[in-house]
């Protein structure tokens, strides 16, 4: 058993998004992404299905050119290889669930290139 908090020990950065793997299980990786208002994660794809959960804040979640407004508590799922982007409309905490087969380093590269 493991216990983590997505809302404790927050270290937002005004210059870049902050990612942290908070939990890894036999089937998934749970990543926290901290975004300041206005920060953009440029369009990218995931090689496996993902789940995005807005823990706090508001995000414009672009999927193949269509913007979906996500607010605190909302979740969205995407199949593999679907282009998507995120724009923080307010300071936001995002929970990203990756397949165990996916790499957290891939997410870090997307953030670094955004």
Predicted regions, residues:
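Short acidic-glycine-tyrosine-enriched beta hairpin
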Residues: 65-80
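A cytosolic small-molecule/anion-sensing beta-strand core signal
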Residues: 55-56, 71-72, 90
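Ligand-binding loop in jelly-roll beta-barrel domains
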Residues: 80-103
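A short, N-terminal "cap"/entry segment at the start of jelly-roll beta-barrel domains
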Residues: 1-27, 111-114
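Glycine- and acidic-residue-biased ligand/ion/polar-headgroup-sensing regions
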Residues: 48-59, 64
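Conserved short histidine dyad/triad with adjacent acidic residue
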Residues: 29-46
């Amino acid at each position: 058993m493991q216990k983590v908090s997505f809302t404790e020990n927050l270290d937002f950065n005004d210059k870049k998004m902050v990612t942290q793997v908070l939990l890894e299980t036999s089937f998934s990786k749970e990543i926290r992404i901290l975004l300041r208002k206005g920060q953009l994660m440029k369009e990218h794809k995931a090689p496996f299905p993902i789940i995005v959960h807005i823990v706090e804040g508001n995000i414009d979640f672009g999927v193949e050119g269509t913007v979906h407004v996500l607010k605190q508590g909302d979740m969205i799922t995407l199949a593999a290889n679907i282009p998507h982007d995120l724009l923080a409309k307010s300071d936001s905490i995002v929970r990203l669930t990756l397949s165990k087969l996916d790499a957290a380093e891939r997410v870090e590269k997307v953030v670094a290139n955004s």
